Amino acid sequence: GLDALRPPADMGIDVVSLNLKQQLEHPGMAPETFSFQVKTAVTNVSEAADRPGAIATVEFKLKQSEVDLLACSRDRALFCYVYNYEADSLTDAFEAPFICFWLDGTLLEKVRSGGAFFRKEGEPKLTLACQLRKPKHEYGHWHAVVVDEKGSKVDGGYLGVVGGSGYPADDEADHYSVVGYLKYARSCSGVAEKSDSLTQ
């Protein structure tokens, strides 16, 4: 139900989503605006048939100004897409060809305070490192963890599991879909309840 717009210049935001159509159809509906930055990474992690479990670290590069902009508000979020050279090694319960996870502005500020962003020697941009982990046990699910420069989980860095209901994220949000982000952001702002009452 949101309209997506792409800012004309490199402002640190890739996509702005607005509920303009819903406001026209329901004049009493509160306006919603969400801003997204999208980053991608590639990995070749896979789980060997005779050796269950896997782990890989992926890195995303952001300008200091991008982090500052995103960390200002919960209605801004960083979406990280990880593509894999190895077919099906990162598929979730819905056979997705890649893993995607998000961190909203509040969580970005929290992990930043915990040392999540660091600058490598000779690089102008900040590095955000995330580990993709698959437990060794039979029923384990892939999950993403934000880590510091030494590879240790930062406060708030556990994002829950992909395609599973157990072991939720530290904030109990679904960090692996756009729908999960919108649901979480709206529940925190109280917009969801207002929108439901207007569309009934």
Region spans (language model):
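Mixed-charge (Asp/Glu-Lys/Arg
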Residues: G1-M11, S17-Q200
